[in-house]
Amino acid sequence: MAMARTKKGPLLGVVDYTLAKRAVLRDFRRGLLSRLDICDAHPELMRAARYVGEEISRGCPVCAESRLRVLAYVFADELKRDNGRVWTVDQGAALAARCRDAKCYVVEVCTGCSWNHLSEVFVGRDAV
C-alpha cells in the first residue's frame, strides 16, 4: 500500500474512505449497529483475503484479535480478462496507473470476525 501512496507523478488520484469507516465504527460502539451488521464479509472476499491479501500492522477495529489484511480489485475496460480480478495492493495500483480508465478498490478484511470495509480507491487520473 505504501507504493501507491508515495509514488510521485501523475499516476493516480486517491479517494480515501477513512471518515466513512470511522462513522461505521462509531455507530457500532454506540450500539446503533450490531456486529452482524458490520462483520458481513462474503465468503469469496474472505477466501481472497486469506490467499491474496497482505497482512498489515493494524489490528481489527472490531474484534482486536486478528490483524487486518488488504487486497485490491481493479476494474478497467482495457484489462479485458484481468478486469475485476483480485490483486495485492501494489499490483492493483500499478495496473490502475497503466490504464487510464482504471479504478483500484482497496478493501481491508479481518479473517477472524469478517469485518470488511472499503479503504480507498485509486483512480487513473484521466478517469477523474
Where do the PLM segments sit?
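N-terminal alpha-helical interaction blocks
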Residues: 1-42
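Generic structural motif recognizing short loop/turn segments at the entrances and edges of beta-strands
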Residues: 8-15, 64-71, 100-103, 114-116
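Generic alpha-helical structural element
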Residues: 13, 49-52
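Residues in flexible loops and secondary-structure boundaries
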Residues: 27, 36, 76-81, 121, ...
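Short Cys/His-rich Zn2+-coordinating modules
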Residues: 35-50, 88-96
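Residues immediately within or flanking Cys/His clusters that coordinate Zn2+
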Residues: 53-60, 106-110
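Short recognition patches in nucleic-acid-associated and regulatory proteins
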Residues: 57-59, 64-100
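Short, compact, well-ordered microdomains
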Residues: 96-128
